Amino acid sequence: MGLPGGWELVLIVGVLVLLFGATKLPQMARSLGQSARVFKAEARGMKEDEEAAKREKQAKSEPQQLTAGESSAPTVASPVEETQRNDSKK
């Protein structure tokens, strides 16, 4: 039992026209299309939120992955060391 064929589709459309009337069918189709667009937009929004949460989680975990030889803050030479280096070059 597969998909309905040509005559079966005509019969289904005829029954729909009799049940709902010719004026209601375009309105129902339009409403169905709008609902599908809203559903797609919400699904896309949820996917983007999920990806943003993953990126945020990765950003938080990256600074914690330092090796033993690395330090988290850059080191700055004190002014005393700089003057001693300059004096020794002269």
UniProtKB/Swiss-Prot annotation:
Which Gene3D superfamilies does this UniProt record tie to the protein? 1.20.5.3310
* An example Gene Ontology biological process: protein transport by the Tat complex
Q: Which family does it belong to?
A: Belongs to the TatA/E family.
Q: What is this protein called?
A: Sec-independent protein translocase protein TatA
Amino acid composition bias (Basic and acidic residues), ranges on this chain: 42-60
- Which source organism does the UniProt entry give? Saccharopolyspora erythraea (strain ATCC 11635 / DSM 40517 / JCM 4748 / NBRC 13426 / NCIMB 8594 / NRRL 2338)
Q: Sorted alphabetically, which PANTHER family does this protein's record hold? A: SEC-INDEPENDENT PROTEIN TRANSLOCASE PROTEIN TATA
Question: Do you know which InterPro entries this protein is assigned to?
Answer: TatA/B/E, TatA/E
What does the organism's lineage look like at the top? Bacteria, Bacillati, Actinomycetota, Actinomycetes, Pseudonocardiales
Composition-biased stretches, type Polar residues, lie in 61-75
Bilayer-spanning residue ranges: 1-21
Alphabetized, the UniProt keywords read: Cell membrane, Membrane, Protein transport, Translocation, Transmembrane, Transmembrane helix, Transport
GO molecular function per UniProt: protein transmembrane transporter activity
The protein's location, in the record's own words, is: Cell membrane
**Function, as annotated:** Part of the twin-arginine translocation (Tat) system that transports large folded proteins containing a characteristic twin-arginine motif in their signal peptide across membranes. TatA could form the protein-conducting channel of the Tat system.
